[in-house]
Amino acid sequence: MEKFELKESATTPRILINSKKGKIKLIGTSTLHNPEEFYPKVLNIAQKYFDKPLEETKVTIDLDYYHQNSFNYIFQFIELIVGLEKFKRTKLKMMWHHHPLDQGIAEDIALISKTLDYQIPTMSYELVS
């Protein structure tokens, strides 16, 4: 698999896994009614990259909203990504973008960072109309 891309919808995030360039993106909203039917398939596809990662992997996360059921799978996804660097299988360049006033996402990032003992870099932004 060189590239897997799932376009964003009203309830699913855009997911990009580009094995040739070492890029992973998770962008948008995740409010699926049945994330247990969606995310395991995505994790299986991602595992193909995780089995043979490039020397450097660039990860961009920009989720503007997700519910708790999706969060559990997002956590698993990030845990696998962070594991690549912890086991020295890739040099990880990760950035999680979020709105500065979104306390829920900021708290989730802090929780994931603490749980995985890995400081996830963040960048806050404000949408300009």
Predicted regions span which residues?
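A cross-taxonomic marker for long C-terminal extensions/tails that follow the last structured domain
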Residues: 2, 107, 113-129
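STAS-typified acidic loop motif
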Residues: 2-40
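Glycine-rich, often proline-containing surface loops adjacent to acidic residues and nearby aromatics
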Residues: 21-25, 55-60
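Short, well-structured hydrophobic secondary-structure segments
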Residues: 31-56
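Amphipathic alpha-helical interaction surfaces in cytosolic regulatory modules
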Residues: 37, 42, 58-112
